[in-house]
Amino acid sequence: MKICAITGSTGILGKRVLETLPFKFSKFRGNIANFKEVKHWIFKNEFDLLIHLAAKVPTKQVQSNFKKALKINHIGTKNIVEALKLKKNKPEWVFFASTSHVYKLNHKKVKTSEKEKLNPLSKYGFTKKKAENEIMRLKNMKIKYCIGRIFSF
């Protein structure tokens, strides 16, 4: 059975992943913005896959506390990538939950292509775009990854 490391397992999406996917899970339960905590969890556990769902999501909360959102969404993701860089036994695959907010979309224009240039209109989209840039660094480590841009209007 595959072992899957997961962040954000207490959120709406995380709970569904735990209920649905047939893996043994290693859940991160700490401060994603704290590199030492992230590194300890990554080094303490052996896993085949990593699903990164932890995020500060409600756009109103991101607007009201941008600094905290940036720490969770961007720095938290950077911490995962940096810890994986140091880990000898790397996962086969990483999934990162991003958002449609990385595109320049509005309620009138909801049709887009994944090839469209990233141009976030919101602070939330900005934090997730920065996080996506961190995830793309996994390619240099020969780790396969998928960035899932979840649409919600």
Where are these predicted regions, by residue range?
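N-terminal Rossmann NAD(P)H-binding glycine-rich loop of SDR-like oxidoreductase domains
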Residues: 2-22
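SDR active-site strand-loop-helix element
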Residues: 7, 50-54, 94-100, 148-150
